[in-house]
Amino acid sequence: MGQAFSITPARRLSGEIAVAGDKSISHRALMLAALAEGESVIEGLLPGDDPRSTAACLRALGAEISGIDGPSVRVRGVGLGRLHEPADVLDMGNSGTTMRLMLGVLAGQPGLFCTLTGDRSLRSRPMLRVVSPLRQMGARIWGREEGGRAPLAVWGEQLRAIDFVSPVASAQVKSAVLLAGLLAEGLTSVSEPVRSRDHSERMLRAFGAEVLVDGTTAAVRGPARLRAQSLRVPGDISSAAFWLVAGSIVPDSQLLLSGVGVNPTRTGVLDALAAMGADIAVENRREVCGEPVADLRVRSAPLKACTIGGEWIPRLVDEIPVLAVAACCAAGKTVIRDAAELRVKESDRLATMARELGRLGAHIEERPDGLVIEGGHRLVGAGVESHDDHRVAMSLAVAGLVATGTTEIADPDCATVSYPQFYEHLARVRQQ
């Protein structure tokens, strides 16, 4: 158990922040570079625990990766279908994205045997949503609960293309199937009820794969051949969300968040905060390596309640913990619904946020698929727990900026999973 993090109310927040590189894009950049022919250069890669887990797995499979903690990461790929059999178990750490996407990468490598595991949290998370469609393609995957929980064992096979209809909008499911489809003969497609984030489709196309998108259906034609690329990873809007909320609720604040990815499949947090009355300007829009990027300027503003649900959820699911903090400071009753997926993240984020914000005095009701938050009640500093969940830890730190007294967050270091510089940036922008 690490040392607790203490936070007291901020008088104001000001300054410019270059938020950490996008976690979702960082994973995909490493994986596709490892599967490509030649040497790729990736700038702005997130230097967090999760991408390190991905890099370690790819090294064990034969890719050469250097400079993982520096500004430019170099990856010499092995080419599709040429991964090496690892000598040991592949440890995914805490990264669900690594495990689910690597299942798709490994399933179509004929004759390759791998065992995948992770930490206690990851071993409890559901994997059948990915394993089932891969099995439909001919994958041989075994594990606890009939392949529903790690550790998982994979024996690579020649896969067949399928048309998969996903019951949920999940970028991880979609990406795993599309990655497996790179080595299957023909067109592999995934249809979703609502379009999930599309980083995989954009990046696969950049690396030379034939990708087709029609509404909520994405498809890839195999067998494919990937070519090395030079990439820049934009700032993570999920990390920017902490500052968007903090800058909104701390009085007299103004923050500029530079170089943030504003992919429309990820900008639900901007829509939700706009509905709550936040003062956020999207400036200097541009495109970087196929991804839309902008600078975000946030100024403090009185917030009002809104309803968050439906088609918004896939576009802001990772930001719901910090949006719950915003709701505590908004006038009226905010309803968050259709978010049962949060129960199977690094923690049960609905239960966790209800419990921990309740400790700070929030009027919050947990529901099976969401939260109901009666805003406008003053938060009071107290001891709270991160539950070893990076987004919970950082959300509680944002709450501590407006809670009276001192808020003590137990096990705060889990923030390094997605935003290693978070506490450093917090110290820099707060004005005592």
From Swiss-Prot:
Binding residue positions for phosphoenolpyruvate: K23, G96, R125, Q172, R349, R391
Xref: PROSITE patterns: EPSP_SYNTHASE_1 (PS00104), EPSP_SYNTHASE_2 (PS00885)
Pathway field: Metabolic intermediate biosynthesis; chorismate biosynthesis; chorismate from D-erythrose 4-phosphate and phosphoenolpyruvate: step 6/7
GO MF term list: 3-phosphoshikimate 1-carboxyvinyltransferase activity
Gene3D superfamilies hit by this protein: Enolpyruvate transferase domain (3.65.10.10)
GO BP terms, alphabetized: amino acid biosynthetic process; aromatic amino acid family biosynthetic process; chorismate biosynthetic process
Annotated EC: 2.5.1.19
Catalytic reaction(s) noted: 3-phosphoshikimate + phosphoenolpyruvate = 5-O-(1-carboxyvinyl)-3-phosphoshikimate + phosphate
First and last residue of the signal peptide: none
Keyword Amino-acid biosynthesis (UniProt): yes
Protein's cellular compartments: Cytoplasm
Cellular component annotations (GO), alphabetically ordered: cytoplasm
Active site residues according to the UniProt entry: D318 (proton acceptor)
InterPro entries: Enolpyruvate_Tfrase_dom (IPR001986), Enolpyruvate_Tfrase_sf (IPR036968), EPSP_synthase (IPR006264), EPSP_synthase_CS (IPR023193), RNA3'P_cycl/enolpyr_Trfase_a/b (IPR013792)
Transferase keyword on record: yes
Keywords carried by this UniProt record: Amino-acid biosynthesis, Aromatic amino acid biosynthesis, Cytoplasm, Transferase
Positions annotated to bind 3-phosphoshikimate: K23, S24, R28, S170, Q172, D318, K345
CDD domains membership: EPSP_synthase
Family according to the record: Belongs to the EPSP synthase family.
Matching NCBIfam families: aroA (TIGR01356)
Subunit structure: Monomer.
Classification via PANTHER family: AROM/DEHYDROQUINATE SYNTHASE (PTHR21090), PENTAFUNCTIONAL AROM POLYPEPTIDE (PTHR21090:SF5)
Protein name (Swiss-Prot/TrEMBL): 3-phosphoshikimate 1-carboxyvinyltransferase
Source organism (scientific name): Gloeobacter violaceus (strain ATCC 29082 / PCC 7421)
